[in-house]
């Protein structure tokens, strides 16, 4: 179907988002066209504001509007326990259960040789530097229970073995192939409680 150029560009923009195919992009584009102009402007401002004002924490790699982030800056947090997750959204999922009191390290990805992503392409070098500089006693590997997440957890555990730092892996109450962000608080809580040393 041939659309006027502004609609085509809007559809193309929506298709750049993960999980949005052509049909959904068309629906979203026409939804935006039906919105009040003020709502569209607010939406556009929110996008620009998020892009301009959010950054990654220089300590843990979590997305934040200040540096260090509110978690790293919280003196009540147990700085000796670092939970390693793949994405900022995984931190949000872990925080929802309101049980974990340590800090995080966000890798912003996972090792995936098929996609050409190696250890140097994600936040692993920063993790190693952080572990040298801080007095960390335990690293909890909370990467996703899929092939890439498991490979990443195994790689990190082998790297940390000589350091003497206790390395644990969250238990799998999580479905294999699933993502942390979709797990409910109870499942995440049980997975954290049942972590094992690796």
UniProtKB/Swiss-Prot annotation:
Membrane-spanning ranges: none
Domain Toprim intervals: 80-175
Keyword field: DNA damage, DNA recombination, DNA repair, Metal-binding, Zinc, Zinc-finger
Gene Ontology molecular function: any one: zinc ion binding
Chain coiled-coil ranges: none
One Pfam short name: RecR_HhH
Zn finger residue spans: C4-type: 57-72
InterPro entries recorded: DNA_Rcmb_RecR, Rcmb_RecR, Rcmb_RecR_Znf, TOPRIM_dom, TOPRIM_RecR
UniProt key word Zinc-finger: yes
Entries under PROSITE patterns matching the protein: RECR, TOPRIM
Family: Belongs to the RecR family.
Function: May play a role in DNA repair. It seems to be involved in an RecBC-independent recombinational process of DNA repair. It may act with RecF and RecO.
Protein name as catalogued: Recombination protein RecR
Naturally occurring in which organism (per UniProt): Bacillus cytotoxicus (strain DSM 22905 / CIP 110041 / 391-98 / NVH 391-98)
């Amino acid at each position: 179907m041939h659309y006027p150029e502004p609609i085509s560009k809007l559809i193309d923009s929506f298709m750049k988002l993960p999980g949005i195919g052509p049909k959904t992009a068309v629906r979203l584009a026409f939804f935006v066209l039906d919105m009040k102009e003020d709502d569209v402007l607010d939406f556009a401002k929110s996008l620009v504001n998020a892009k301009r004002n959010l950054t990654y924490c220089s300590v843990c790699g979590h997305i934040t509007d200040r540096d260090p982030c509110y978690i790293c800056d919280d003196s009540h947090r147990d700085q000796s326990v670092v939970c390693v997750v793949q994405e900022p959204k995984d931190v949000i999922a872990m925080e929802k259960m309101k049980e974990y009191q340590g800090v995080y390290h966000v890798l912003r990805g996972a090792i995936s040789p098929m996609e050409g992503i190696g250890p140097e392409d994600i936040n692993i070098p920063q993790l190693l530097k952080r572990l040298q500089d801080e007095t960390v006693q335990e690293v909890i590997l909370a990467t996703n229970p899929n092939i890439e997440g498991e490979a990443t957890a195994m790689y990190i555990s082998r790297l940390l073995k000589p350091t003497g730092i206790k390395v644990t892996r969250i238990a799998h109450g999580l479905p294999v192939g699933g993502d942390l962000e979709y797990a409910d608080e109870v499942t995440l809580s049980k997975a954290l409680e049942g972590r094992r040393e690796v």
